[in-house]
């Protein structure tokens, strides 16, 4: 499968080269009086992009979508069996692949074309509106969604926005709460190493110093990342949470929500999973968040941050104390 996935990057290369060459040419011809937002160090796309450049960007991102999802070449779907959680392959269903209703055997993301459309739309909104901050995904599998986000930001010359790729890179943790979902930890197909994910970024020419891999179960890694973001005064313009479990969603929201500025977005991949939905509902209620929820692809949702709130981190610290954790895995 690794060889097949490596070859997929070639599909995107010609379009990428054309887009880059045209962009370089246009910058050389661009007059000095074009509006540039100096504080963001990026061109305002609505003012600076030519129609040809927009068309090339559109082709590049569409090509990425059908490649990263395995849609273009009808990649078979992984079907999870029962008992020993065996892996079975079945023919691709076009509708399921579009909305992220299956797991591609050859591909880089399971969120479907609609899920990637959502990332593109929200990133374009924050770019257009001048909302500062990075893209962060917590729970990345093979890295495809984060790769696509990086590609979108690159295509708009967003050179100052980081991409944070957060995962254990060894699958989901066993649940420590009796009402949480524990079977995820038994699914070996969810365990993809950091080296493999990093390699995927490299194959698509998306790996640079602005991409950061944060490894570890969220309860151990995200409190440390929280400290790092505070020290660096980083913001998160788009936060994508894909934790599947009650505990994981609480880890993500309590450690990272405070960094999303007004106008930024929270994407919840697992709105269709009851325990994950419960965590999000409790977090929103606890912090009196009334922002409108926008469902999409049947199982996910997002909302836009409308006001800054102090996160009740002391509650989270007490919650962590109730969990059976491995002190040796503590990172900070």
Name the predicted role of every residue range.
Residues 1-39:
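N-terminal signal-anchor transmembrane helix specifying type II single-pass membrane topology
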Residues 51-61, 71, 90-113, 129-332:
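S-adenosylmethionine/decaboxylated-SAM
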Residues 3, 43-46, 330:
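Intrinsically disordered, low-complexity regions enriched in polar/acidic and amide residues
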Residues 84-89:
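Long intrinsically disordered, low-complexity regions that are acidic and Ser/Thr-rich
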Residues 39, 45, 312-314:
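Compositionally biased, intrinsically disordered low-complexity segments
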Residues 41-77:
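N-terminal auxiliary segments of SAM/dcSAM-dependent transferases
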């Amino acid at each position: 499968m690794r060889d097949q996935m490596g070859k997929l990057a070639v599909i995107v290369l010609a379009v990428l080269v054309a887009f880059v060459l045209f962009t370089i040419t246009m910058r050389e011809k661009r007059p000095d009086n074009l509006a540039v937002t100096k504080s963001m160090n990026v061109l305002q796309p609505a003012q600076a992009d030519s129609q040809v450049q927009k068309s090339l960007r559109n082709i590049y991102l569409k090509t990425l979508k059908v490649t990263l999802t395995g849609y273009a070449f009808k990649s078979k779907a992984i079907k999870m069996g029962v008992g020993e959680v065996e892996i079975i392959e079945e023919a691709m269903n076009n509708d399921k692949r579009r909305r992220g209703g299956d797991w591609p055997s050859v591909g880089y993301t399971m969120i479907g074309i609609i899920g990637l459309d959502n990332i593109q739309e929200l990133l374009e909104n924050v770019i257009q509106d001048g909302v500062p901050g990075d893209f962060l995904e917590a729970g990345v599998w093979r890295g495809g969604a984060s790769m696509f986000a990086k590609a979108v930001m690159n295509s708009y010359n967003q050179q100052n926005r980081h991409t944070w790729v957060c995962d254990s890179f060894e699958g989901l943790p066993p649940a420590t709460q009796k009402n949480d979902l524990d079977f995820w930890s038994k699914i070996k197909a969810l365990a993809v190493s950091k080296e493999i994910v990093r390699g995927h970024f490299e194959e698509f020419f998306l790996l640079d110093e602005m991409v950061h891999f944060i490894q570890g179960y969220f309860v151990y890694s995200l409190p440390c990342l929280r400290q790092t973001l505070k020290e660096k005064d980083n913001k998160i313009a788009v936060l994508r949470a894909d934790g599947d479990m009650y505990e994981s969603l609480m880890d993500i929201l309590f450690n990272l929500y405070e960094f999303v500025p007004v106008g930024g977005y929270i994407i919840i991949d697992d709105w269709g999973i009851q325990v994950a939905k419960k965590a999000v509902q409790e977090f929103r209620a606890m912090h009196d968040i009334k922002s409108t929820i926008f469902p999409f692809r049947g199982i996910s949702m997002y909302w836009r941050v409308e006001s800054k709130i102090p996160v009740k981190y002391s509650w989270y610290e007490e919650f962590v104390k109730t969990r059976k954790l491995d002190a040796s895995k503590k990172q900070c």
